Amino acid sequence: MTTFEKVQGMIAEQLQVSAGSITEASRLVEDLKADSANVMVMILELETEFGIEVEDEVILNLKTVGDVVKYIDAHQ
């Protein structure tokens, strides 16, 4: 399973949307309707799943699913 597929599944579960509707270009807030609480929960789950730590200031720069995937791949 690729990083994208794992992230896609986690986001789909958290936001209760179809995994098929999530692409790397999907914007977390604008397209997927994530609010700040959703984003924080997703980040905590991603940190646990991938064994990484996401700094608070970085979270603001993670706008799309692709941004999240690239960050994880670069920090694993």
Predicted regions mapped to residue ranges:
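Phosphopantetheine-dependent thiolation modules in NRPS/PKS and related acyl-activating systems
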Residues: 2-34, 38-43, 48-49, 53-76
